[in-house]
Swiss-Prot record:
General function of this protein: One of the primary rRNA binding proteins, it binds directly to 16S rRNA where it nucleates assembly of the body of the 30S subunit.
Pfam family, one: S4
GO biological process terms, semicolon-separated: ribosomal small subunit biogenesis; translation
Sequence similarity: Belongs to the universal ribosomal protein uS4 family.
InterPro entries linked: Ribosomal_uS4 (IPR022801), Ribosomal_uS4_bac-type (IPR005709), Ribosomal_uS4_CS (IPR018079), Ribosomal_uS4_N (IPR001912), S4_RNA-bd (IPR002942), S4_RNA-bd_sf (IPR036986)
Keyword terms: Ribonucleoprotein, Ribosomal protein, RNA-binding, rRNA-binding
Protein's name in the database: Small ribosomal subunit protein uS4
Length: 206
């Protein structure tokens, strides 16, 4: 297991969620926090600790920095409707998130790598910013020259679908063509992340 994989497994156990397929397998065997006292019952947590952990869980699932998550919160406070729902919808339209949801990548880290290495097109143009927000109607696709690479051939066979959640309703995916279209704005209840978003809002609003 690589150092990165080991860190992801440890973080998964600490946060109580599986962040990668490998972490999922290990988490099923050892569903408790890492360390000498991981099996023991947690002490009663403060309200602050509970909300901090939810914020960390959301950050980890999208693989983003504290600055990026706070920016999503600030944007949500200026959006009509509930701040938490606006945050989730905004984060879910990140390019790296949609590359993962489509099954083109196996993990968030791999999705980000594909984008940064200029393998991903949006409406035919290379976009190398994982934080790029995809708009409804836009299509993401693996660059034709990259489609012969082994990772993308594996994805085109649908291999990652066995370890990822079902494709959400806001994506129209053609894996054989390594292509996906965001058909509409994601609804918070259909976004496949594990988080109490209200706790995250309360953490930042304190």
């Amino acid at each position: 297991m690589s150092n990165r994989s080991r860190r992801q497994v440890r973080l998964s156990r600490a946060l109580g969620i599986a962040l990668t397929p490998k972490a999922q397998r290990i988490f099923e065997k050892r569903p408790y926090a890492p360390g000498e006292h991981g099996r023991t019952r947690r002490r009663a947590e403060s309200d602050y600790a509970v909300r901090l952990r939810e914020k960390q869980r959301l950050r980890a699932q999208y693989g983003i920095s504290e600055k990026q998550l706070r920016a999503a919160y600030e944007k949500g406070t200026h959006t009509a409707g509930q701040t938490g729902n606006a945050m989730l919808t905004d984060l879910e339209t990140r390019l790296d998130a949609l590359v993962l949801r489509a099954g083109i990548a196996r993990t968030t880290a791999q999705a980000r790598q594909f984008v940064v290495h200029r393998h991903i097109l949006v409406d035919g143009n290379i976009v190398d910013r994982p934080s790029y927000r995809v708009k409804p109607g836009q299509t993401i696709q693996v660059k034709p020259k990259s489609q012969t690479m082994v990772p993308f051939q594996i994805a085109a066979e649908g291999t990652h679908r066995d370890v990822l959640p079902p494709v959400p309703g806001y994506l129209d995916v053609n894996l054989a063509s390594l292509k996906a279209t965001l058909t509409r704005k994601p609804e918070p209840e259909e976004i496949p992340v594990q988080v109490n978003i209200q706790y995250v809002v309360e953490f930042y609003a304190r």
